[in-house]
Amino acid sequence: LDALIAHGMDVARLNFSHGSYENHALLIKNIRDAAKRAGRTIPIIQDLSGPRVQEGTSHHLDPSAVEVITEKDLKDLDFGLSQQLEYICQSFVGSAKDVEQLRSEIFARNPDYKLQATSFPKVMAKVERKEALDNIEEIIDASDAVMLGRGDLGKDIPIEQVPFAEAMVVHHCKEKKKPIIVATEMLKSMVDNPEPTRAEVTDIAYAIILGADAVMLSEETARGKYPVEAVTVMEKVCLEAEKFEREVNAL
């Protein structure tokens, strides 16, 4: 964690599809201790599972699910609030109603939550289904931030449409001044290899040039062989993309 922070990690995401509360609590403590040693603040995102079914090692939306927020999510939310996590991210949102339901659940557990506009936790919507794309503007309006989960989205729409969905979501988030994280398989090859592919580097740069506020690693840092190298590559590409933007804007 010390090395990840030193090489460019700004936010940590905890995937509540996996792991025990005991393991998550230890990881939260370790993240905060490492951030303190570095003189940094590292916000933590609690990524709720949502209505998933598992096939082998992958998860996807349960099509029979009526409610996006499950009983497991509510138990996980209680844990996240007890740990004072900075962001709660709801998976598989389809409309503003799903986001508002999560906010209501937070308010029910902490009546003072609504009284402070700057208070945590912030509510993040994960966009990863066609219905969310159809309702993207109302979802952004209802959320404090958005995460684009391209993996599950690519199962719900034709995969060739994913880059254009990404551009559309980022555009609307920038227009409405809401932070947007682009996620999934950004440096997938670095799970097993110390260097990225040219296509992966281009993918990261594309997201930044579109206007994404953050790009996210998952497997690369959760179970990959080269987590620090992956963060280092991502940091370098982001800085180059931002430099390019400044040069273009100066013309």
Give the location of each predicted region.
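Non-catalytic helical/linker scaffolds that mediate oligomerization, partner binding
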Residues: 1-251
